[in-house]
A protein has these predicted regions:
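C-terminal-of-GTPase-core extension/linker across diverse P-loop GTPases
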Residues: 1-169, 174, 179
C-alpha cells in the first residue's frame, strides 16, 4: 500500500459518493429512496462512503443569512448543511485537518495531514517558519471563541506553549514563534 500510494493510481484513491436527491425525497426520509439504497449498495461493495444531500436545498441555504440558515436546518432536523458535511467527510477520508492563524488583518485556515507536527505545519505558511521554529502558541478554536479574545484566553491560562514534537489538532488556533 505504501508503494502504491506514491504512484497515485486513480483506482486506489478513497471514494465518497455524494447522493443528490430531490428535496421531496430528501425531506421524506432518505432510507425510503430506492436510488439512495442502490448507491449505498455500490458504496458498500467498494468500501466507500455515501453522503445524502439535496443540491436544490443547498442552493437555497447558500442564499440565507446565518440565523435563517440555522432555523431552516433545525426545521429539517439537520445540524449542518450538506456542503459542510461533505467537506468534513472529504477531510476525514483524506486524513486532513485544518488549523487557523490570525493576525490583525487576516484570519486564515491551513490544511495539513493529520499527524503533522508543529514545525511542519509552520512550514506550510513559509519555509522560514519551519527552519527557524522556536515554539507554537496554541489554543483550541472553541476555547478562543468562549474567551472572546486571545488576551482573555492568555489571562485564563488557555494558551499553551508547544514545542517541536507537538502534533497539530483540528481547530487549533496558532501563533508560530520563529527566528531566522
Amino acid at each position: 500500500k505504501a508503494i502504491l500510494s506514491e504512484v497515485a493510481l486513480l483506482t486506489n484513491k478513497p471514494v465518497i459518493y455524494a447522493a443528490n436527491m430531490s428535496d421531496e425525497d430528501f425531506s421524506n426520509g432518505i432510507d425510503s429512496n430506492e436510488g439512495y439504497k442502490a448507491v449505498q449498495k455500490i458504496a458498500a461493495e467498494e468500501h466507500a462512503g455515501v453522503l445524502p444531500l439535496c443540491a436544490q436545498i443547498e442552493e437555497e441555504i447558500v442564499e440565507m443569512d446565518k440565523e435563517e440558515k440555522e432555523m431552516f436546518l433545525a426545521d429539517m432536523g439537520l445540524e449542518e448543511s450538506g456542503l459542510d458535511r461533505l467537506i468534513k467527510e472529504c477531510y476525514a477520508l483524506l486524513g486532513l485537518i485544518s488549523y487557523l492563524t490570525a493576525g490583525k488583518q487576516e484570519v486564515r485556515a491551513w490544511t495539513i495531514k493529520k499527524g503533522t507536527k508543529a514545525p511542519q505545519a509552520a512550514g506550510k505558511i513559509h519555509s522560514d517558519f519551519e527552519r527557524g521554529f522556536i515554539r507554537a502558541e496554541v489554543i483550541a478554536y472553541d476555547d478562543l471563541i468562549a474567551c472572546g479574545s486571545m488576551t482573555a484566553a492568555k489571562e485564563k491560562g488557555l494558551v499553551r506553549s508547544e514545542g517541536k514534537d507537538y502534533v497539530m489538532k483540528d481547530g487549533d488556533v496558532v501563533l508560530f514563534r520563529f527566528n531566522v
